Amino acid sequence: MKPATTVVLLRPTKSNDRREAFEVFLVKRAARSGFMGGMYVFPGGKLDPADQTDSAKKLVSQSGYLRWQERIHSSDFSRPAVDEALAKGLLVASVREVFEEAGVLLAKVGSTGQVLQTDVTETKTRFLEWRARLAKGECSFADFLTAEDLYLDPVMLTYFAHWITPSREKRRYDTRFFVAYQPIGQEAVVDDHEAVDGVWRTPKEAISDYRQGDIALAPPTLRILEDLSGHISVSHVIDWAAGRDVWPIMPKVGTVNDQIAILLPWDPGFEATDGESILGLPHPHPNAEGPSRVVLEGQQWHSRNDFAQSSVDD
């Protein structure tokens, strides 16, 4: 099982609809991708060895770092603690993946301490060249940041969810989710390699697009969008993310009424379903919010509650 990271980029909308005045950025994985090919997902990926090198770790600001590391330390005592190498690796990988896939760089300028802006044509061109070199493996992410006098501030990413691939799957990831505000003066543009399309949508718009068959979503992405759809602004989302306790969620896959179902740890049928469980979690699960299962009905996933058979988006 490989450690991985996912980043939900946020930006305010220009709409007058105050019920959901923010958007999230979704990228479409290339069809040839071995994992979630053709799906619309949030930017992210697995940790690379280079994300945990000394040169990469030195680029992480110590200001606020210890508190950030403690926050992402799992409360599940049956799993290894999140040490400095993994914590900083997650931060580096998060920023690297967002830059590679979306062209947004969540970094600060060393000489000023200000959030990076790339709206100047010369700067934008230079950073596109760096992005191309990274894609070709001609330089490391640490080399790039060092050359541009940039550093990573943990405050720019807020941890809010932890999903682990079910034990029955061959390709498994231990993924931590973060939310981040897209810096002013930067623009999200996909790389046309790992990602072939990118869209900004409010959570409700993204779910609607899925229901209409315009985009494909995996169950974790659908659940995250549903969780976010109850918020009204970027600041509201970040405050919610910073204030919630995060415990690992490792679903089980079973069959309910002849339908494939992904059962979350607080589902009444979870314990009776075959599959690995995380030991040491309190019951009920501390993150027992919303639906308890995601059911494949026809060609689409629907979030359901065992006690009330109605979908979240009905």
Range-by-range predicted roles:
Residues 1-314:
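N-terminal leader/linker segments that precede catalytic domains of diphosphate-processing enzymes
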